[in-house]
Amino acid sequence: MFGAASRMDTTAVCTGGVTESRGIVDSLQKFSSLPAYLPTNLHISNAEESFFLKEANQDLTRNSSLQARVEPFFIYRARTPPIINASYGPFSVEKIIPQELLLTSTAFGNMDKFPFNWKLKSHILDSSIYSNRPKVQTLFYVTGMGWDDSDLTEDLPCVKMFAFPEAREVAASCRLQGAPGLCVAELELLPEWFSSGLDLEPEEEIPALLGGTTMELFFTLYPADKAGQCPLEEEGKWENNIHSGLESPQQAFPARERIGSVVVYPTQDDLKWSLVSLDENVVISVPLNLVREGDTATFLVSLTSSSVADQFTLRIKAAAGVKITAVRVSSEDQWAVQEEIDNGSTQTSATLTCMGHRPDTQSRVNGSFYEILQVDFGIDNSSDLAGAQQITWQVEYPIEDSMSELVVSEIFVSQTTFVGIVPLAMDTEVLNTAILTGKPVSVPVKVVGVQEDGSVVDVSESVECKSADEDVIKVSNNCDSIFVNGKEMKSKVDTIVNFTHQHFTSQFEVTVWAPRLPLQIEISDTELSQIKGWRIPVAANRRPTRESDDEDDEEKKGRGCSLQYQHATVRVLTQFVAESPDLGQLTYMLGPDWQFDITDLVTEFMKVEEPKIAQLQDGRTLAGREPGITTVQVLSPLSDSILAEKTVIVLDDRVTIAELGVQLVAGMSLSLQPHRADKRAIVSTAAALDVLQSPQQEAIVSSWILFSDGSVTPLDIYDPKDYSVTVSSLDEMVVSVQANLESKWPIVVAEGEGQGPLIKLEMMISEPCQKTKRKSVLAVGKGNVKVKFEPSSDEHQGGSNDIEGINREYKDHLSNSIEREGNQERAVQEWFHRGTPVGQEESTNKSTTPQSPMEGKNKLLKSGGPDAFTSFPTQGKSPDPNNPSDLTVTSRGLTDLEIGMYALLCVFCLAILVFLINCVAFAWKYRHKRFAVSEQGNIPHSHDWVWLGNEVELLENPVDITLPSEECTTMIDRGLQFEERNFLLNGSSQKTFHSQLLRPSDYVYEKEIKNEPMNSSGPKRKRVKFTSYTTILPEDGGPYTNSILFDSDDNIKWVCQDMGLGDSQDFRDYMESLQDQM
């Protein structure tokens, strides 16, 4: 495992730019934020909006193996079943996301034939129910259904609306029709329920309702019968099950959903009026009810409580078709009225002169009005009037010779009688991605009116609309859509858009989600260094960086190359939030622990502030170019503001490739499961099938790079033009390697059964930067192979992407990894010795891969589970004694390869033991021989003798010793022993010693010593000659003797005659003691 304080030992051999790791990394300087996983490409299709996710405090062990990649994702909106695809190289597997993982609406959840994004919405037309109108009307419609979707209209289900007054069920039904699936359910209440006050539950009674009681409404969906009708269930069938809260075990009824509540009043509903003041004396009461052709609308003329007027003239004008049919005096004993009415063909006019007694203002209640007249307006049957018709009012006072301003009132004429209007939208949520992309996001809207008989009329052309807060959401001029354009400053839950038609007003509630700013930029490595030994071609105008200063000038290859810089992966994350309507707190779409990957949305708006320092490639890979500090930015598409910023440092330091992890990929498998904490998030696991199970089955390899600074990156993020790879087989009987013309990666082909580190991957620099004198190999890695042939079965042929055959143990490991709650501090990565098996598992499960690397057709692949020999390890798993699969793996027999390895190990151990015995015997014999040499006069014996002297004649005539070829000889140098006398030589002689150790025995090296002795009296020069001699082994088996012997030490002339050790006798004693020690 490697982390912030981890320290690992490494032994590496570097020869000619080749790095072959022998262990694990030493003293990692930093921890990469990018774990080592299978670098598969994941793609979601058939989804209108979907996001990959990152979980806060995510378990690092979830992605800790080169064999698999685990990614959570979220489907925000989809009409058809989404499909997730995982691919790597030529292998691909896809899976349809099942409906149970999408958490679709419970109303349509049991009906698979409808789109996933359909939701049933309800709108109660009038929440106040009176005894004179004992009818509850609710409009149902389908969100997510297009206005023009007519394919599924014939299969739309029925809706049942029901309530439980006085412990009895009252129900009504309707069938969804057309697009977007509209119907109105009408629930009729019995008269006795109003008189009894509706004996409802105590908690449902609200005293503030002034005598009214609440009644809860519910609905459920069920299919229509063969005739297309919606018959209701038998009376009382639901009573004992739903009202009592019990559920019948014998029969499962459709799930019910709550609609809302209505208030039931025992009184009659009064007409609704609107007051219009003509001046401080006269007030007109305008009815708000719709008027159809042939009907009459009554207007009331009253005096205010403070009025003292007793005579005035009222002038009225109306459009043609609106006629004054009657004028009635409310108090004939108090007021008299003279009428002048003209119901002409072009205009209706009337003059009403009112005279009465002076009113008694003290007898009126404060704030009340004194009614004088009732004026009836009738609608002509042949007028074809529709909409609001204006009526003008003006009052004059003859005595005072004054006149009021002209006041306009309206009467609403309709061909039909509306009871309310309802705005319909295709969705009740808006995801404001316009802030990120600059592209507006809109939701179509329609407005329909519901008549008394339950029929629905489209009134979209004659409505008015206005947003309650345009900083959250806007509405189009013709009221046919609501939209966001990226200029909004806020987001909100249940923000309101008002729609008005005639005198009806309806509010549409919509939730707007917006990205939380600033965005978060995640870079796997924010410190990029040069990679030692990896040279890439550079442009002619850029000065190349030399790897070393001692390169020969005649080397033309590589002269236009510079060192490669490290690469890092980049992604942009954010959270979608909305403010709560009451407290103003933030509400998260998936919760505060989730971040959405929005890199694809902002790729074209990402840039590096200093492109000469670093460069973005495809918006997801950051490559260093030259040392410096710069920032990666996400710019706003609508302004010059910066939405996100991250600092990156490109260093002049050099790192080496410490490890090259290799993973065999013979196919792909894919599994899905809900997240343990939030069921709306789905966790996908894409795994590599690494067991070759049929002869000539093909596979490719995947590789990761571990650098000496601790960062890890997949090799795939580097440009293929900057490197080349060579894959070779270490056992041609098990696997062979074939060249692939369509890809840079060679193909591994199964030949026979076996397993182990049998493939070797060599990574080399590109051809333009190769040097002629040495092969620039950057790193070598070994990958593990497992070939186990199994008999094919016809029932597994076909190429369907079945994931049921994924190894059970691997699935359990991934499940445990996802379900893990804690222990984050120990979840760090492990890098093991190359080729060292981390486990050996047998596989019995099966899977298929749809495509082969060369032929591009379906082949049978059976899953072998996790690789038993991964170069970078999978997360370790302890055997569970309660798990039968673990017991099976533990108790299996040894394979032929394992038996051979154990036998070879025993032979090695035996050889080592014999070697140790020989060493002991040799040491014992050598000890006796040394004692024998000492008894013969302390004649020193050494392999390194040095002859020193100042007689020119002696030095210029080296001794020629010729040995018979049949005699046993050993090479020594005549002279003093090197280990004790090397301090007598000058420095230049010492430097050449290491080169002389590898010279042959007949090689004579001469060098003049230029230093003069301290007592030199002339220009005579000292000369030193190194000569190799031999020691002759006596025929009688006695002790070794030298081929050239000297009588005494007096014949030796030393280079340094005075060592400061005292007189000559002391020096001789010192030398004799050293010889005795040898």
UniProtKB/Swiss-Prot annotation:
<keyword id="KW-1133">Transmembrane helix</keyword>
<feature type="glycosylation site" description="N-linked (GlcNAc...) asparagine">
    <location>
        <position position="381"/>
    </location>
</feature>
<dbReference type="Pfam" id="PF23039">
    <property type="entry name" value="TMEM132_3rd"/>
</dbReference>
<feature type="compositionally biased region" description="Polar residues">
    <location>
        <begin position="841"/>
        <end position="852"/>
    </location>
</feature>
<dbReference type="Pfam" id="PF15706">
    <property type="entry name" value="TMEM132_C"/>
</dbReference>
<keyword id="KW-0812">Transmembrane</keyword>
<dbReference type="GO" id="GO:0016020">
    <property type="term" value="C:membrane"/>
</dbReference>
<dbReference type="InterPro" id="IPR055424">
    <property type="entry name" value="Ig_TMEM132_6th"/>
</dbReference>
<feature type="glycosylation site" description="N-linked (GlcNAc...) asparagine">
    <location>
        <position position="343"/>
    </location>
</feature>
<dbReference type="InterPro" id="IPR031435">
    <property type="entry name" value="TMEM132_N"/>
</dbReference>
<feature type="topological domain" description="Extracellular">
    <location>
        <begin position="1"/>
        <end position="903"/>
    </location>
</feature>
<dbReference type="InterPro" id="IPR031437">
    <property type="entry name" value="TMEM132_M"/>
</dbReference>
<dbReference type="Pfam" id="PF23487">
    <property type="entry name" value="Ig_TMEM132_6th"/>
</dbReference>
<dbReference type="InterPro" id="IPR055422">
    <property type="entry name" value="Ig_TMEM132_2nd"/>
</dbReference>
<keyword id="KW-0472">Membrane</keyword>
<dbReference type="InterPro" id="IPR055421">
    <property type="entry name" value="TMEM132_3rd"/>
</dbReference>
<comment type="similarity">
    <text>Belongs to the TMEM132 family.</text>
</comment>
<feature type="transmembrane region" description="Helical">
    <location>
        <begin position="904"/>
        <end position="924"/>
    </location>
</feature>
<dbReference type="InterPro" id="IPR055423">
    <property type="entry name" value="Ig_TMEM132_5th"/>
</dbReference>
<dbReference type="Pfam" id="PF16070">
    <property type="entry name" value="Ig_TMEM132_4th"/>
</dbReference>
<protein>
    <recommendedName>
        <fullName>Transmembrane protein 132B</fullName>
    </recommendedName>
</protein>
<dbReference type="InterPro" id="IPR031436">
    <property type="entry name" value="TMEM132_C"/>
</dbReference>
<feature type="topological domain" description="Cytoplasmic">
    <location>
        <begin position="925"/>
        <end position="1078"/>
    </location>
</feature>
<dbReference type="Pfam" id="PF15705">
    <property type="entry name" value="TMEM132_N"/>
</dbReference>
<dbReference type="InterPro" id="IPR026307">
    <property type="entry name" value="TMEM132"/>
</dbReference>
<dbReference type="Pfam" id="PF23486">
    <property type="entry name" value="Ig_TMEM132_5th"/>
</dbReference>
<dbReference type="Pfam" id="PF23481">
    <property type="entry name" value="Ig_TMEM132_2nd"/>
</dbReference>
<keyword id="KW-0325">Glycoprotein</keyword>
<feature type="region of interest" description="Disordered">
    <location>
        <begin position="834"/>
        <end position="887"/>
    </location>
</feature>
<feature type="glycosylation site" description="N-linked (GlcNAc...) asparagine">
    <location>
        <position position="366"/>
    </location>
</feature>
